[in-house]
């Protein structure tokens, strides 16, 4: 779906859906949600005959990031992304229920014509003075 895996942090995966001359911001948001839903569905199939269930939560935000080598030549250096958009996505993942995709209002506005929402609510996240409007995705609609 056009993702770039940025890193694995413990049991978390940070994936990027980057805009390009061939891929719009809206398409990136759609593909991110599609990938999250596909991962959840794949785990449902995987878990069918398992006693110990594997579950994931998905948090998706859209926005500007700072991308590049972070660190120094003398110590650890990683090519990664940082910024408020990344932090919000991480907070959404933490706030999501197991087996669900939670998107920011920014992401929702990019794909609102192609997504069915199960629930909309506001959450308080660390580092933000105001509550964030978030949407729990029920399903994507065909483009």
State what each model feature region is.
Residues 10, 38, 106:
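An acidic- and aromatic-residue-enriched active-site/binding cleft used to recognize and process polar
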Residues 1-31, 44-84, 132-135:
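Catalytic core of nucleotidyl cyclases, primarily class III adenylyl/guanylyl cyclases
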């Amino acid at each position: 779906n056009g993702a770039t895996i940025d890193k694995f942090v413990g049991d978390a995966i940070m994936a990027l859906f980057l805009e390009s001359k061939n891929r719009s911001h809206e398409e990136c948001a759609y593909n991110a949600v599609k990938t999250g839903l596909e991962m959840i569905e794949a785990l449902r199939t995987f878990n069918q005959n398992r006693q110990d269930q594997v579950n994931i939560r998905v948090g998706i935000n859209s926005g500007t990031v700072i991308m590049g080598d972070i660190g120094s030549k003398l110590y650890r250096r990683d090519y990664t992304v940082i910024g408020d958009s990344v932090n919000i996505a991480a907070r959404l993942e933490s706030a999501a229920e197991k087996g669900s995709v939670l998107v920011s209002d920014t992401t929702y506005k990019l794909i609102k014509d192609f997504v069915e929402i199960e629930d909309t609510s506001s959450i308080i996240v660390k580092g933000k003075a105001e509550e964030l409007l978030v949407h729990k995705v029920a399903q994507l609609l065909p483009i």
